[in-house]
Amino acid sequence: MATAWAPDAGRTSWLLEVGPGLLGIAVAAAVHRRLPLSHWVHVCIFLHLLILIYGGYYTYALTPLGNWAKDAFGFARNHYDRIGHLALGVFPAFVIREVLLKKTALARDGWLYFLVLCVVLAVAAFWELLEWWVTLLVAGDVGQAFLGSQGDVWDAQWDMLLALLGAALVLPLFARAHDRSMARVPRRG
């Protein structure tokens, strides 16, 4: 929260970037008694929030880490935005997976994997629509900074693809670890 005091990007931009993560924490806290989440998911939420806070402090297009990579590897743009969208697939995938396993009769099979990927892609697409709406509604630089396309006409498509790939890659690799973490949480509701 200290990054909200005087973010380089300005408070409005910071709130737009970090607000959804803070809302996610509020929702997780509100439903904790009915739907206790695993330690794995809490770590995912924390790591995702760190990425959001860092990007929100500077704006994703101006993060020092992204600028360093841009200079070091000769990239045409700051790719921290891409890291953020990859994270939009990686970390929420486990939240979605856990909720589906706890609140539905889905088995741990291909349908679960497919549905988690569908929800991740839907969230990524909604985020792209949200970026567009904010650009239309919020004045000048803040709206453009939130959009973060950096002149790439395919930015929205890349962002959605990266979220989908992030989820598609981590789910098979870490599903068993996630299952072990869920097994240590009593099932309620």
Where do the model's predicted regions map?
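"…centered on the first transmembrane helix and the immediately adjacent amphipathic helix/loop
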Residues: M1-V90, F94
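Short, intrinsically disordered terminal tails adjacent to the first/last structured region
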Residues: R187-G189
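Membrane-interfacial alpha-helical segments at the cytosolic side of multi-pass membrane proteins
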Residues: L23-H32, A87-T104, L136-V142, L161-A177
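Membrane-interface capping segments at transmembrane-helix boundaries
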Residues: A175-V185
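Short hydrophobic/aromatic segments of transmembrane alpha-helices and their interfaces
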Residues: A2-A4, D71-A72, L112-L115, E128, ...
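Lipid-exposed faces of alpha-helical membrane segments in multi-pass integral membrane proteins
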Residues: A2, G19-A26, V43-Y54, C118, ...
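Interfacial helix-loop-helix junctions of multi-pass membrane proteins
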Residues: P7-W14, L62-G66, Y80, A124-A168
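Internal alpha-helical transmembrane segments of multi-pass membrane proteins
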Residues: T104-L121
